[in-house]
Amino acid sequence: MPADVKAAQSSAGDSRPGERDKALDLVLGQIERNFGKGSIMRLGDASRMRVETISTGALTLDLALGGGYPKGRVVEVYGPESSGKTTLTLHAIAEVQKRGGVAAFVDAEHALDPVYAASLGVDIENLLVSQPDTGEMALEIVDQLVRSAAVDIVVVDSVAALTPRAEIEGEMGDLAVGAQARLMSQAMRKITGNIGKSGCTVIFLNQLRLKIGVTYGNPETTTGGNALKFYASVRLDIRRIQTLKRGTEEYGIRAKVKVAKNKVAPPFRIAEFDILFGRGISTLGCVLDLAEETGVVTRKGAWYSYEGDNIGQGRDNTIGWLEQNPEAKDAIEVLVRQKLTEGSEVTANSMRPLAAAARSAAAKPSAKTADTDKKLVADGAA
């Protein structure tokens, strides 16, 4: 080995940690002077370790997301028509406004119902609303709102309605292949960095389309190309799985949300909750579901019981009891949150199987099973 190489390796090995630290501090200071404070930082800084969240309005979905929508990130919510996408985001807006935050709604579909939004708890007097003419206008408005650092949440409804200017100015039937995908790709490159710096959460609602000629696998895809899929930190797939009825009257739907992507918590979790027509997400229903799964409320047959007392026959009657007894409801919710904080087995990976297991465990055992259990207890005592 040449002597100069040996000398270089020796000098590199003999360099003192103090000198390396000085060199690192020097280059970090130079980078911050050139590009601004915060352009480079240590990942372990206390201000960067924990990602703050915004509540979704559904306790079960908050659990599945690891706390709620992450601040300073892009979120995509997609699903078929009438599945609860807009309702979900209006609840997020209401939660932000309750805490004194500022919310904006970019209504590209021109379909926002102020009366319905107000019924969900949205302060429509202070809600910023834009109904843009083109997709470029909508995304430029989003970018300016984000860069202001004065807005906490921006909702875009929806990506499918972000029509490029060239398509609007052209004639009906003209082909504009890939125009919307190029628009979204350029916008996401520009907006994402500003979103992280400002701490604003931007939620894009999206529609489903079917791929042509797909024989195997899922033929469903979202509009606007692939850029949003990559830039989104959280992607939620919401589906309508049941229609809630009282007799022949329909009063709501049962929604199921799958966390298709999550960069800030474990993905692929599933949450279910009720959406009541004209009232939005049933918070009492979420509390009852988690109370049953954590064992705070037990169910035998059709009866729900709390602290040994029957509180309602059937789910609807039990929810009515919780509504009439707010103190008991608050106590149950506190116990549920304590169990979840202590690391309960409920992880929201699949809410329905856990509930089924709890019901089967609470069911009355057969005589043969009871005899077996007695034998096992006797053997354990021996």
From Swiss-Prot:
PROSITE patterns: RECA_1, RECA_2, RECA_3. ATP binds at G79, P80, E81, S82, S83, G84, K85, T86. One of its GO terms (molecular function) is ATP-dependent DNA damage sensor activity. Residues 360-369 have a biased composition (Low complexity). It is found in: Cytoplasm. PANTHER family: MITOCHONDRIAL DNA REPAIR PROTEIN RECA HOMOLOG-RELATED (PTHR45900:SF1), RECA (PTHR45900). This is Protein RecA. It comes from Synechococcus sp. (strain CC9311). The gene is recA.
